[in-house]
A protein has these predicted regions:
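Solvent-exposed, non-transmembrane regions of membrane-associated and secreted proteins
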Residues: 1-196
Length: 196
């Protein structure tokens, strides 16, 4: 499953590059029933000799619709939530053992960047992390304020399914100038599409 999940991100990246060029939705492969709707980057804090997740500032491509099939290929936007870049609560779900394994150890203050299909980059700051029961869905509810909510199963070190707990990260938008000046974090500015 992990190999499929990581390989799919390369195909999704190509579809995303096309979306940024022409503004249209592009399927990553011919039989896909989804398409990328955003690009998510999670910044790594500058802490010497500390490793709290996979590699550097790798970006993840977010698919439309958080179905089980889509989550096998990458994080996915919960369709009942606000679209990336729109007013409201944008909710993205991902598997704890693949793409959202990088949320393990994320802390308040960390910066996230979300690129929309229009090419606009929104920088967010993590304001809360918490573990909740799967029945506590109020964190996914629509809101009038702008926020980004990331959700994955918990605990991270359990590889079998059936988890009743969810790890939730909540972030709010910050001004780009403020984000770039953040002490102890770097901003991933490699959000331009790669065109072959």
């Amino acid at each position: 499953m992990q190999a499929k999940a990581h390989f799919a991100q390369y195909l999704i990246e190509q579809a995303w590059a096309k979306t940024l060029i022409d503004g249209q939705s592009h399927k990553p492969w011919s039989w896909a029933d989804t398409y990328p709707v955003a690009k998510l980057s999670i910044e790594q804090a500058k802490r010497p000799n500390h490793f709290d997740g996979p590699a550097s500032n790798d970006s993840l491509y977010v698919l439309a619709g958080a179905s089980g099939r889509n989550l096998a290929f990458g994080p996915a936007l919960v369709l009942s939530s606000a679209p990336a870049g729109a007013q409201g609560n944008t909710v993205i779900a991902g598997h704890r053992d693949t793409h959202f394994a990088m949320l393990n150890g994320i802390s308040v203050g960390r910066r996230l960047a979300l690129q929309t299909a229009a090419g606009r980059e929104i920088v967010y700051q993590v304001v809360a992390t918490q573990v909740v029961h799967e029945s506590q869905t109020e964190l996914m509810a629509p809101s009038e304020d702008n926020r980004l909510t990331l959700i994955t199963c918990y605990p991270f070190d359990v590889l079998q399914g059936g988890a009743e707990l969810r790890f939730v990260v909540q972030a709010i938008p910050v001004e780009p100038e403020t984000a770039a000046q953040s002490e102890g974090a770097t901003v991933d500015r490699t959000l331009e599409p790669k065109v072959a």
